[in-house]
Curated annotation (Swiss-Prot):
GO molecular function annotation: single-stranded DNA binding
Name of the protein this chain belongs to: Mitochondrial genome maintenance protein MGM101
Species name: Candida glabrata (strain ATCC 2001 / BCRC 20586 / JCM 3761 / NBRC 0622 / NRRL Y-65 / CBS 138)
Claim: DNA damage is one of the keywords in the record: yes
GO biological process, one term: interstrand cross-link repair
FT transit peptide: 1-22
Compartments it resides in: Mitochondrion matrix, Mitochondrion nucleoid
C-alpha cells in the first residue's frame, strides 16, 4: 500500500508536489509520478566509464556552433580555419627547416625523439611568440593509471590540428604533473601536421642518425646489478641508474 507523502515545508512548490503525489495514489497512478527537474548536464556513458569515480577534472563550456555569446570563437568546439588557407612562405620555410642533430635525443630502447621545448621554439620561430596556442578540446579524463585530454593547436587564428595527449602516473599526487605531461604530448602530436620533426618518422633518417650519432653499450643497473644493452648518444656518458 502506498504511503501518503507529507512535507514539513510550507512553500508552494512543496505543497504542489505533495498534492500531486497524493492525488496519484488515490487514482492508482502513483508509479507514473514524475517531476520536471532536469539533470545539470549529460555525460556520455563511455566517457564516464573512463573517468576517475565517474568524474572529470573540469566542466565543459563548449558551444555546439563554436561561437560564444560575445561573437568570438569558442575553440573548445570550433573548427574555424582548418584547411582553409596555407600559411605564407616565411612561415612554411621556418617550419620546413631540418632538425639539428644536436637537438635530437635517443631513449635507452633506441627510440629517437625531439624534446618538447624544441617544438615550442620552432613554433615561436615560425609564428612568433603569442602567434600560436594550445587549446583544450575535451575534459581531462583520469583513469586509475592514465591522464588523457584532447587539445587543438591554433596558429595565427586558425585551427591547425587536433590530437589527444596522454600521460601515465603512479600515485594520486602525480596527477597534476601528469596533466602537464598530457598537454606536452598533445602538442608534439599536433606539430606532426605542420611537418615539424617529420624526419623522426623517416626510417632512412632514423637509421642514419643512429649510425652517425649513437651507439649501443652494455651497462649495469645500479640497483639490480642486471646487465643490459642500451642506446646512448656518442657525445654522452652513461648516467644513473646505469653504470658502464
Amino acid at each position: 500500500m502506498q504511503r501518503l507523502l507529507k512535507f514539513s515545508g510550507h512553500g508552494s512548490r512543496a505543497l504542489f508536489l505533495a498534492r500531486r503525489w497524493n492525488s496519484n495514489i488515490a487514482s492508482g497512478t502513483a508509479g507514473t509520478f514524475q517531476t520536471t527537474a532536469k539533470p545539470l548536464r549529460s555525460v556520455k556513458p563511455t566517457e564516464a566509464a573512463l573517468a576517475l569515480n565517474g568524474k572529470f577534472l573540469e566542466s565543459t563550456n563548449g558551444n555546439e556552433n563554436g561561437i560564444t555569446s560575445m561573437g568570438s570563437i569558442d575553440w573548445y568546439t570550433s573548427w574555424h580555419g582548418l584547411g582553409s588557407k596555407p600559411f605564407d612562405a616565411t612561415v612554411q620555410k621556418a617550419l620546413a627547416l631540418p632538425l639539428e642533430p644536436t637537438d635530437i635525443e635517443i631513449k635507452p630502447d633506441g627510440l629517437i625523439y625531439l624534446p618538447e621545448i624544441k617544438y615550442r621554439r620552432i613554433l615561436n620561430r615560425a609564428f612568433g611568440a603569442g602567434g600560436w596556442g594550445l587549446v583544450p578540446r575535451s575534459q581531462t579524463i583520469v583513469t586509475s593509471k592514465l591522464v588523457t585530454r584532447e587539445y587543438g593547436l591554433v596558429c595565427h587564428g586558425q585551427l591547425v590540428s587536433v590530437s589527444r595527449g596522454e600521460q601515465d602516473y603512479f600515485s594520486e599526487t602525480g596527477i597534476p604533473t601528469a596533466t602537464e605531461g598530457c598537454k606536452s604530448n598533445a602538442l608534439m602530436r599536433c606539430c606532426k601536421d605542420l611537418g615539424i620533426g617529420s624526419e623522426l618518422w623517416d626510417p632512412v633518417f632514423i637509421k642514419r642518425f643512429k649510425t652517425e650519432h649513437c651507439v649501443e653499450k652494455f651497462v649495469t643497473h645500479i640497483a639490480t646489478s642486471k646487465k643490459k644493452k642500451i642506446w646512448i648518444r656518442k657525445d654522452r656518458s652513461v648516467e644513473y641508474p646505469y653504470k658502464a
